[in-house]
Amino acid sequence: MATDFKRYYEFKDDLDEVIFHRHDMPSPWMNYLTNGTFFTMISQAGGSLSWYRSPEIWRIGRYNFYNLPTDGNGLFIYIKDKKTGKVWNPTVIPCNAIPDEWYSAHGFGYTRFHAVKDGVTVDLNCFVGTENALIYDMNISAETQREISVFACREMGLMEYLREVQWQCYCKASNNILYDEKTDSLSYEYFVDAQPRPDETPKVFFAANMRSVSHDGSRKSFMGSYRDFENPISLERGACGNSDLKGGEALFAMQFDLTLTNKPQNLSVFLGTYGQTESVKPLLDKLREKNYAEKEFKRVKNRLSERKKYFSAEIPDKDMQRMANVFNPLQAYVNFLVCREISFYATGTVRGIGMRDAAQDVLANVLYDLPASEEKILLLLGQQYNCGKTNHYFYPVEKREPLVSDRSDNHLWLVYAAYKVICECGKTDFLNKTAPYFDGGEGTVLEHIEKSVGYTVDHLGEHGLPLMLGSDWNDMLSNVCKEGKGESVFVSQMLVLACKQLKEIYAIIGKDDKTPDEIIARQEKILNDFCWNEDRFIRAVSDEGLKIGNRDEKCGALWINSQSWAVISGCSDEEKLRKCMETAVSTLDCGYGLLKLYPPLQRNYPSKEHELTFAQPGVNENGGVFCHANTWAIIAECMLKNNNEAYKIYKELIPHNIVKKFGVEKYNAEPYIYSSNIRAPMALDAGQAGVSWLSGTASWMMIALEEYIFGVKPCYKGLKIQPCIPDEWEKATVKRFFRGCEYTIELDNSAGCGNSVKEVYLNGRRFDGEYILSSAPTASVRIVTGKK
């Protein structure tokens, strides 16, 4: 039943966790554990994969994305009762012996398991602390004295996933696992020829804070023949084979013997990396310090509290509050670090860093970590050419050639990112920093973003709209410009917004240049004269001159982006803007978000030679609920002061709410973070979500919530507060850290008019200005809604 989600999971808001009551979810429900250099993704059932900096070239262990059993690889802990011989796992998998009592939980940067079986209790905390190591910290106890063995194992593979798939027959001769008696640790070394960065490839260690009694480095020695992780031969024998490995199938395994009482015993297992020329001993000494794991776990758990100091909200809608304070910030943080490289849906092999993806991820991170955001923008600018275009994907860690594919939108996102920095810090210093051009030379940040605008202006089509080039944000439109003539309405709207931001920057720095005004005027005229179609803006113009998104077309007659971005860019008059969004919402709202387009594209549309779709009707980009695009619709509704409509769309898209509508099994993906897309009502398996975690939805949903629904928007001159909360809320409280001051903002909506501001009070005194900026460490703001 759709309402029976509590059999699967529930939220513990006092702990800021999601609790899982069973291990066998319809798909692995992941979490990310990281210190920014060492990463692990881990599921509710303990399946996991770790990597150091890059999952493409420094992967630690195997993870079989498409094989059965699903989620069948990870760092596994086995509990064996020496008397009875029974074996089980606190994660349930891989032995699948169901504990008498069990749950797992994901929090911000950690995952934990609680399991009780046959009188033995295990509490396991999984996290990555300050050092580059995954820590499995266990407290184990028993009702009566018990003798047990704990086996910990992690199958290793070649660090380069694609090389392993293609050349493992030869390359697996170039690895080893050796045991060191002095440090009681296993070390893995990968030294295959022609690695991308061989001098920086780390060694991997496996150890614990307790002396082992046996170990293995050979998979065959630990597993035996024709067995899997459910029944390794070493567990039957009661000991590992004490094997080393010099070429072959690698695996870390260690055995620890414990005598249990009702007083918990601690065992911490470590899987981490260290430098090629370094000794592992100093790192192990640190990890093995008394109470080290306990202290590090507390520090990791405190990360969310530190993040909440920058932004948090207290509102009547607790599902929305949870997303605002915990899981949306978590997802946005992971996207900033990982981009779109690796998840349960992405194998981490060829994606690298995407220009448009990373530039949008920055937008939500500026609030939390301005220096890291500036550094990321400079990295992205280094992929721009002197002409203004950018590489599409690039590989700063892997050091291989970028994907040059010329997309019409990539470079414009850089303008928004640089503008965001200026608005957050209130300084223009960043504009004067320099970044190289990919094809030689260097320029200031300002010069780079000017070239971004210039490149679009230099590539206009027959009708004066920007050429689609390889595609715009919507990859499905790649065939629109196959012959070099197709044009993008969406990019025209992006250009208008970029020029408005550039114009504001010019005003701030005192640069007298009317170029942005001229571009805005030309593009707005074309958008209104040529692209307006009764009650909507068309989406694109094909090579043949077909207006894609024309209301009379049998497919794709309405696209959400060219309506929402008309509002976001402010490219037309209020009447048209209201009309196009009214058309979009009334046509596209399916009850769990807005469809990306309607009707879905069909095969051979508009012709066999120029077919647009690569997905089934109602699936993914072809008329599914594409969550990223919905964030812009929410922003547009707020800009039009349609507060209740904005709230409705936001609520519909909360994953937990969709689960309550369709049920856990049908929704399939995690109910605590956003997926990229959800199947539309007309599709088979309607309501099924796909491609979770890594999505631009994370960044833009935070912006939609913080800056538009709550209305707390950073501007160069200060905070501009224009809430657009639902009329039904009586009040809301937002905390926002801005330029050294912690603002507590009370939104008083007693009047039930959540889209307008009647009065503003700063520290108890009436404030009539437009921008709020305090030099004190704290400030209180009270916004009274209502008509003036």
Which residues does each predicted region cover?
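Active-site acid/base region of carbohydrate-active enzymes
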Residues: E314-P329, Y368, I377-K389, W413, ...
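Catalytic cores of carbohydrate-active enzymes
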Residues: C153, N391-H392, M494-H610, K651, ...
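Aromatic-rich carbohydrate-recognition surfaces in CAZymes
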Residues: K263, I353, D357-A358, V362-G464, ...
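Surface beta-strand/loop "capping" patches
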Residues: P714-I745
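C-terminal beta-strand-rich structural cap/linker in extracellular carbohydrate-active enzymes
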Residues: I772-K788
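Anionic coordination/interaction segments
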Residues: M1-D357, P371, K376-L380, K420-E424, ...
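Carbohydrate-binding/catalytic loop surfaces
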Residues: S343-R351, H392-N410, F438-G440, T444, ...
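Short strand-turn-strand beta-turns centered on an Asx-Gly dipeptide
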Residues: Y761-R765
